[in-house]
């Protein structure tokens, strides 16, 4: 991803960091999938292989990918558009930084109580915080999912009124 390339060119460091993140997330005893969103995420294939984790590849049809994300227990990512797809189904996200304000703004739009963006290459301590935050949002269950889903629907409904305003 462009955020990673700004952070480091060291592919081994990137793969090692994400392997560590995936392995720590596995301690939550939930099924983990690695989601390859764009060509810049190709390194995630190696992460999936090294951690023995299922991969949702870049060529997954958008409707299928959206359904997977919308029904996930949680989504850890710095990717804006997949986070929107996840949010439409109420999936809580734990956000990593991107090279723009978008993921922070999305959290604010969806009225997240704790607006946080973790670094794209998190330290061991930050990985533990990501895992803890992921555990918390999963424990929020249907209440958290309903809150996110309802807010996403409200925003969607509001967006439809824009066409009336600009006629």
Outline where the language-model segments fall.
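Active-site anion-handling motifs in enzyme catalytic cores
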Residues: 1-167
